[in-house]
């Protein structure tokens, strides 16, 4: 009967899968650190991602940001996020891209050190933020896409490049 044939076939497939699973698990575990990625979409996702920054354990955030685009898409950034970050005593060190230097880019009140990059020299389509063992990348648009990558090795590499450039 057809049902018996299907049951026998399924039992065989189950047996084959059970035989392969331990070696797959062993292979996967032997790969070392596996980065974890999280995706965020739309304005709500961008806000959720910024809320993640406020949970930083090291109390230090590094960033590469296009101020002109940031304030175009999130005009309330200073009040909505920066003030809260400063209240939580989270410092930031930022390379900011803009058409001209911004008056209060360096701010003790907002716990921010900043270095200017002229937008003629660098066109950013996304911001990059480095904190703890995470890197976030978020596009500038009315419907932004953001990703957070959690990886100690990747974060150390990007942070080392950031610090090298900062020291120049």
Predicted feature descriptions by range:
Residues 2-36:
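Short, charged amphipathic alpha-helical surface segments
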Residues 4, 11-12, 48-51, 145-146, ...:
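A compositional/biophysical signature of low hydrophobicity enriched in polar/charged and small residues
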Residues 20-23, 52-54, 130:
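Short hydrophobic/aromatic-rich motifs at helix boundaries and adjacent loops
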Residues 4, 11, 40, 72, ...:
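Charge-dense, low-complexity intrinsically disordered segments
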Residues 26-124:
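Mid-protein regulatory/catalytic core that forms ligand/cofactor-binding pockets
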Residues 11, 75, 79, 152-155:
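Short, conserved loop/turn and helix-capping segments at secondary-structure boundaries
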Residues 115, 120-168:
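Amphipathic alpha-helical interface segments
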């Amino acid at each position: 009967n057809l049902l018996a044939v299907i049951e026998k076939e399924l039992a065989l497939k189950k047996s084959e899968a059970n035989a392969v699973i331990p070696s797959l698990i062993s292979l996967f575990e032997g790969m070392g650190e596996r980065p974890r990625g999280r995706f965020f979409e739309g304005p709500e996702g961008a806000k959720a991602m910024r809320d993640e920054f406020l949970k930083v354990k090291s109390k230090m955030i590094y960033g590469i940001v296009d101020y002109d685009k940031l304030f175009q898409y999130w005009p309330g950034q200073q009040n909505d996020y920066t003030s809260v970050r400063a209240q939580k005593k989270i410092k930031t060190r930022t390379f900011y891209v803009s058409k001209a230097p911004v008056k209060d880019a360096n701010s003790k009140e907002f716990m921010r050190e900043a270095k200017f990059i002229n937008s003629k020299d660098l066109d950013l389509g996304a911001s990059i933020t480095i904190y703890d063992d995470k890197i976030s990348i978020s596009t500038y648009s009315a419907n932004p896409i953001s990703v957070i990558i959690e990886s100690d090795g990747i974060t150390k590499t990007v942070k080392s490049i950031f610090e090298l450039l900062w020291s120049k």
